[in-house]
């Protein structure tokens, strides 16, 4: 399952880079694939992380290892579920 985590960031680029490293470590620890941090063309959000997880519970296991920083003012999670035709 692909998981998109859209969020706004009020901190510096350095702080974002440090937080991304924490996310990458949590991914390694739990086996979730960190597929990158991207700038979002969606005018609502500043950034989006892309993850590959076995399921939403697997993703939650990873995300609970990294507390949400104060610079992440709000976020949404979008799940992309594979469809077999």
Give, region by region, the residue ranges found by the protein language model:
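Short S/T/G/P-rich N-terminal loop/turn motif that feeds into the first structured element of a domain
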Residues: 1-48, 52-64, 75-85
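Catalytic alpha/beta core of large soluble enzyme barrels
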Residues: 70-73
């Amino acid at each position: 399952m692909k998981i998109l985590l859209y969020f706004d960031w009020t901190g510096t680029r350095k702080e974002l880079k440090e937080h991304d490293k924490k996310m990458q470590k949590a991914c390694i620890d739990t086996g979730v694939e960190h597929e990158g941090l991207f700038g979002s063309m969606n005018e609502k959000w500043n950034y989006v992380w892309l993850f590959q997880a076995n399921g939403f519970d697997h993703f939650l296991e990873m995300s609970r290892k990294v507390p949400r920083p104060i610079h992440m003012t709000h976020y949404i999670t979008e799940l992309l579920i594979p469809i077999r035709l």
